[in-house]
Amino acid sequence: MQKRLTLLGSTGSIGDSTLDVVARHPDRFFVYALTAHRNGDKLVEQCLRFQPEVAVVGDADTAAKVAAKLRAAGCKTAVAYGPQALVDVSKSDGCDTVVAAIVGAAGLEPSLAAARAGKRILLANKEALVMSGSIFMDAVHDNGAILLPVDSEHNAIFQCLPRESALHGGVSKIILTASGGPFRTREPASLVDVTPDEACKHPNWVMGRKISVDSATMMNKGLEVIEAHWLFNLPGDRIDVLIHPQSVIHSLVSYADGSVLAQLGNPDMRTPIAHALAFPDRVDSGVGQLDLAQIAQLSFEKPDYTRFPCLALAMKALAEGGVASAALNAANEIAVEAFLTRRIGFMAIAQVVDAVLNSLPNREATSLADVVDADAAARRAAHAYIDGLPAGARLTERAVQ
């Protein structure tokens, strides 16, 4: 039987890779809905190719333009817009599988709607778990949803863990690998001069601009530690980060008997996407086989928290609990956007996040409203802090010494 997919964030990097895998297996997958924010032209191209029943965009103007182009091409895809439309296609009876690939906090509510509707969820939107934590996981468990991680690291951990959760007691710790990004060996003092284009040039992975910056600051790895805590029900002190520049080993699980299991593969997101789409089966992803002899050498090192203060901030937020992780994520989104638009320098990203975490009171997250309120407060605080920075400080100051 074909799986019927809603793809949230189809025009982004994960969306592209997902559709590449889907196109290789038309007998297995049917695209029910595609969603984008404002990239209407690309969404039209995708709709003409995959003929979904529904397309969703962020606003009425984009919806009108997309609908007109689809009608002119004879495509019968219905077009909707706005946050509620995202929720609707995520919980619709028209799909059984939701690929959650919207970047940032905007992906939380549709992902949560999919969980409450008992869908099979392929989670690429780590922010959903970072922000809502137990609220999201409770929705998954209470409604019989199936949660499959798409992030390469978490997908690797999932593959290395025993299928039966009762056997997870033999797990000693999990180890998330990180490439170290484009600035792993760069002199720390020179990081104040980093440009957005430099930060977006990842040495191994093809990603969108926001996640590329997060990789460069290693905030992405920090968010992944928080995500792993919720996905695999392990405390932060049993989740390690290991720098692995080649991005061949995607993560590892260490067991009580001294065994360590690892998942390896070429650095291409189509591999974890194909695994999650077809699970428990295996299908062709379009990714070439790994040639270890050609790679010849794999290297590892501990993360440098002085060079990567954002990683330390994420660890701090996880330890504090409550809404701290939601505030961390929100402040980081605002700071990264300010960096990409050249309002602040690269090293000021961590400064903004640290200031927001220190300025806002923490509290327990007992409802989605608590999470949304913390997110909004952190965004306001981040904007205010950036607006109050002297021009020089915006470029040079560091957050964590």
Curated annotation (Swiss-Prot):
Residues reported in the UniProt entry to bind NADPH: 11-14, 38-39, 125, 127, 208
Cofactor (UniProt): Mg(2+); Mn(2+)
Protein name: 1-deoxy-D-xylulose 5-phosphate reductoisomerase
A GO biological process held by the record: isopentenyl diphosphate biosynthetic process, methylerythritol 4-phosphate pathway involved in terpenoid biosynthetic process
Lineage: Bacteria, Pseudomonadati, Pseudomonadota, Betaproteobacteria, Burkholderiales
Known function: Catalyzes the NADPH-dependent rearrangement and reduction of 1-deoxy-D-xylulose-5-phosphate (DXP) to 2-C-methyl-D-erythritol 4-phosphate (MEP).
Amino-acid positions noted as binding Mn(2+) in the UniProt annotation, renumbered to this chain: 151, 153, 224
Molecular function (Gene Ontology), one example: 1-deoxy-D-xylulose-5-phosphate reductoisomerase activity
